[in-house]
Structures are given as structure tokens and as C-alpha cells.
Amino acid sequence: MRTVQRLCVLVVSLLLLSSTGSRAQLPANELEGTWKMVSQKLVYPDSVVDRSGEWGANYKILNSTHFAWGRETKDGETVLAGGGRYEYYPERNVYIEHIQYHSDPAMSGATLRFTARVEGDTWYHIGKVGNFKLREVWKRVDPEKVRAQLRGDTVSTDSRTPE
């Protein structure tokens, strides 16, 4: 029950952060929207650790100025979250996160710089975090599919992960 409460608080926080106010927003960019992680690898000088299968639900939501992400362990016992401001320069393939809050306090205040590109509905980025490079692949969540699921038009195999 406690995990469900934490996940609900996380989802509400992410939704509030991702909601748009017309006067406060910059022009749209291709990163705006909801993304679901499909792959995460930690690339060390002598090895690669694939963490893709270690997590349950794992989403990142971006509006024109801010991002928020949240994920939980497969068993639902642990929820991690973070967010802050971001910069995106598609002409230079650069994505920068300015982390303002994080479930790991040591990450709060950090700035992470990534080489990034979007191809169709897939977002690739890689950047240095500590002593490794973080390589992630995200798929855009189709809002129409989510709306259909909420209306009951389709059946999901996992109600926590709409896509």
C-alpha cells in the first residue's frame, strides 16, 4: 500500500510539472512529451553494464523548460525520482539536465550533459555521469493510446505502464 501511495504522489507531481501554462512556456521542441525508457547501459572503460531489465515503470516527462522522471523497482518496493530544468540544442545534438531535485541528494544541483538525437519516436542520449557514461534509449508514449486505455478501449498487460 505504501508503494502505491508513493507512486501516486510521484505521478501527480510529474503531471503537475508537465502541465503547460501558455504564457510560461517556450516554443515546442521535439522532446516535449512523455517518454518510456527501453534501454539503459552504464559504459565503463573496461565493461558495459546493461540495466535495462532491472526496473519496472520508468518514465520521463518534458515540457518546454523542465523535465521530471520517475521509476520503480519491478517489485514496486522502491521509487526513484528527479527533475529540474533542461536545455536542448538539436542542431548540435546536445541535451543538458540541470537537476534541481533527486531522490539521491548527492545528485541535486548536478548538471549532466548528453549527446542526444531523436529519430522518429525514439530518443537516444549518452553522457558522462561520475566514472561511467550513461547510455539511454527512450520511446515516446503515444498519448492517443493512453487515452484509449483510460477509456477502456484497449487492454494493457500492466496497468502501471500504459504503453
Regions found by a protein language model. Give the residues of each.
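Bacterial N-terminal signal peptides
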Residues: C8-S18
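Extracellular/luminal ectodomains and secreted, surface-exposed scaffolds of diverse proteins
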Residues: G84-Y88
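Bacterial N-terminal signal peptides that target proteins for export
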Residues: M1-V9
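Short, charged helix-to-loop "capping" segments that act as catalytic/coupling loops
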Residues: Y89-N93
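Lipid interaction determinants
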Residues: S19-A81, V94-E163
